[in-house]
Design a protein with these regions (language model features):
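Boundary at the C-terminal end of the N-terminal hydrophobic targeting segment
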Residues: 27-29
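Selective for proline/serine-rich intrinsically disordered segments
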Residues: 2-3, 22, 34
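Divalent metal-binding segments
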Residues: 31-37, 41, 45-306, 314, ...
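Bacterial N-terminal signal peptides that target proteins for export
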Residues: 2-14
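Bacterial N-terminal signal peptides
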Residues: 11-24
Length: 348
């Protein structure tokens, strides 16, 4: 059924009124930047595609075509930026589970040997997808400085590609230099004999942990990592390594097209290194923070709702505490350590 001309005019008039109402009254002093594009994929079912977007103070204020943006252009000063005239634009990605501090530890303080490729500012690292290739790459990296007495750290090992790596494999790489291998999920570490000795980790201490430890294989996972974490940090790690790691992580987030991340369980506080780095003016993404629930009730009478309000009061435009909490109930997904009921993992 075709609409009458009067009905069409009324609908267009209403659209213009709504558009004007939505324009903030405080915007008059701010210039718009309009970006025409070959195509804009909005991911909004009511307007799936567009060809122009208007931005003010780093925020999108309108999306549509140059014609539908006319109310804005007539009301405010603007400039046309042709940078994306022949490009296709789409919203930024969301990474719902990223720990910046952990990313610093893994990417900036380890040699990377993973199944997937990594394209870092420092260079391209080709992935390794079999056991022989992994051990060969590890030997090559350790041999670059064979006389060093500094501990060698590597991250990215995954048994589903590289087979089970044990203390004996690492002893064959070097019987004198401490080697610490961190699994791809970071929920497991493997140490050679030299590393166990240098970190002052004893078999007696390992025996006091009921699960997550294979002493003979030098493997420590999930709860078992508590046996070795203190010794690694105290005796093996260089405290100054990875000092610029947050800048690297921020760069990788940006390069990946991610505009929102969520860190669950590890909650940076105002004034911390992570908060300061990720709340800087140059950072083009937001960080949503989902803290653990523990600790809020250490003060008598404290409530979880009070904690939420106190956290929310610290929010900025980039660092945002949510009303969610993270419970630590299970094992790592990447390492397939989740405690699954029957039939367990059905995809291998």
């Amino acid at each position: 059924m075709r609409e009458s001309p009067a009905r069409i005019i009324l609908r267009v008039a209403l659209l213009w009124v709504v558009t004007w109402v939505l324009i903030p009254a405080t915007a008059s002093a701010d210039q718009l930047t309009v970006y025409p594009a070959r195509r804009i994929i909005t991911m909004d079912p009511s307007l799936p595609t567009a060809t122009a977007v208007a931005v003010r103070d780093d925020r999108i204020v309108a999306v549509g075509t140059m014609e539908t943006l006319q109310p804005w252009l007539e009301a405010f000063d603007y400039e046309i930026d042709e940078t994306f005239r022949d490009k296709v634009l789409l919203p930024g990605f969301i990474d719902p589970h990223l720990h910046p501090d952990l990313a610093v530890s893994l990417l900036a303080r380890n040699e990377i040997i993973t199944p997937e490729d990594w394209d870092l500012p420092s260079g391209f690292i080709e992935g390794v997808t079999d056991r022989a290739g992994y051990l060969a790459r590890l030997q090559e990296l350790v041999d670059r400085d064979p006389d060093s007495d500094k501990a060698f750290f590597t991250w990215g090992y995954n048994a589903f590609w590289h087979g089970l790596i044990t203390r004996q494999d690492l002893d064959a790489i070097s019987a004198t230099r401490p080697i610490v291998v961190t699994q791809r999920s970071s929920h497991e570490v493997v140490l050679n004999t030299a590393a166990l000795e240098a970190a002052q980790i004893s078999e007696e201490a390992a025996a006091r942990v009921s699960d997550g430890v294979d002493w003979e294989a030098g493997r420590f996972w999930e709860r078992g990592q508590s046996v070795v974490q203190g010794g690694i940090r105290r005796y093996l790690r260089d405290p100054d390594s990875g000092s610029d790691g947050l800048a690297l992580v921020a760069d990788l987030i940006h390069r990946g097209g991610v505009t929102t991340i969520s860190t669950a369980g590890s909650a940076p506080r105002p004034g911390s290194a992570t908060w300061t780095a990720f709340d800087a003016e140059r950072i083009p993404f937001r960080t949503l923070i989902v803290p653990r629930p523990g600790g809020f009730n250490r003060r008598p009478g404290a409530t979880l709702s009070e904690k939420f309000e106190n956290d929310k009061a610290t929010n900025t435009g980039r660092m945002i505490y949510t009303k969610g909490i993270k419970f630590m109930l299970d094992g790592a997904m990447f390492a397939q350590y989740m405690q699954m009921g029957p039939p367990g993992y059905i995809d291998g």
